[in-house]
Regions:
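Alpha-helical transmembrane segments
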Residues: 27-56
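Non-transmembrane, membrane-proximal soluble domains of secreted or membrane proteins
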Residues: 2-27, 51-321
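Generic alpha-helical transmembrane segments of integral inner-membrane proteins
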Residues: 37-44, 81, 85
Length: 321
């Protein structure tokens, strides 16, 4: 019985901590079921061909092969059906993927200057993962590839408002927030809109502004998207976090976003799913999911440190002058 349990555990899915990850599991199951159907179908065809064209029935080989169009049409029909299934399944899941990101985690919105605290730029290198976060102003600093260096690994353009309080974390845990949505059911006399989604922080701010009981909002069980804006400094890596059902190649010169909605706090292993060099085994990291309050506290602390460091650097330059 213990052996059976071990086998079941070995073939079961890893822990799921992503709101939409069940769709990925469903896709994996669907693909394997289709593979099973194709396997059984082609095995039946294989043995049917062995039986039909056995040497005792056909002692002399015929180089022309099958003259009936039935077999040819059957094989062609099978190929067409398989392609149609592939297109339908791929279209369904791609449509699902591109429509599950909410308006709070779009990289393009951040690039256009919209405040967004839930986008993390992750840059892979041999053999570590580096993260770049927006500061308290909610804006990610502009980048310039020519500025990338040991003292500026993300190539952040200095002396810009958007990048003044950015947070850079090298070769350490990647921090992301678990933020629950509160849906406005009855806005009352406030400026809020019915159906508007608020974080706990935004909810407290609205209650402080309009007064407790001025509107009705309930936690609807959904969470905010977190977007990883992924790239690489050297070779192709692959950002893979099984519990989040996330896997995406990090390609030099390209910034590719991937989003997910974490549902459980904790530390989850990041592995590299591409052979990226002699130290590939060391290409691992940790993505740490924390609560909204912990995220706010961490961001304030890190932005404060960045600001103090910047002020100290300015003071030093002034003293030298």
């Amino acid at each position: 019985m213990e052996l059976f349990s071990d086998i079941v555990e070995a073939f079961s899915f890893p822990e799921l901590v992503s709101q939409d990850g069940g769709k990925i599991d469903g896709l994996v199951i669907a693909v394997h079921l289709l593979m099973l159907v194709l396997f059984v179908g082609w095995i039946i065809y294989y043995f049917a061909a062995l039986w039909k064209f056995r040497s005792t029935r056909n002692p002399k080989a015929d180089y022309k092969g099958v003259k009936s169009k039935t077999v040819t049409n059957s094989v062609g029909g099978g190929v067409i059906v398989a392609e149609l299934i592939l297109v339908v399944v791929a279209t369904y899941y791609w449509n699902f993927y591109v429509n599950t990101a909410d308006d709070y985690a779009h990289v393009t919105a951040v690039q256009k200057g919209k405040k967004d605290l839930h986008v993390v730029r992750v840059t892979a290198e041999q053999f570590a993962w580096n993260a770049h976060y927006p500061g308290l102003n909610g804006l990610l600093g502009e980048q310039e590839k020519a500025l990338v260096g040991a003292d500026n690994p993300f190539g952040i353009i200095p002396d810009t408002v958007s990048g003044s309080d950015d947070i850079v974390v090298l070769k350490s845990d990647i921090i992301v927030p678990l933020i629950y949505n509160h849906r406005v059911e009855n806005p009352g006399e406030t400026d809020l809109k019915p159906g508007e989604l608020l974080t706990s922080t935004e909810l407290k701010a609205a209650e402080a502004k309009y007064g407790a009981g001025a509107f009705e909002a309930v936690q609807d069980g959904t969470v905010r998207s977190v977007t990883i804006d992924l790239t690489s400094k050297d070779v192709i890596h692959s950002f893979k976090v099984l519990p989040l059902r996330v896997c995406l190649d990090a390609i030099p010169g390209l910034n590719i976003p991937i989003h997910f909605k974490p549902t459980k706090t904790g530390r989850y292993l990041i592995t590299c799913a591409q052979l990226c060099g002699d130290g590939h085994a060391r290409m691992r990291g940790v993505i740490k999911v924390i609560t909204e309050q912990e995220w706010n506290d961490w961001q304030k602390a890190e932005s404060g440190e960045a600001e103090q460091t910047e002020q100290a650097a300015v003071s030093t330059d002034e003293e030298k002058a």
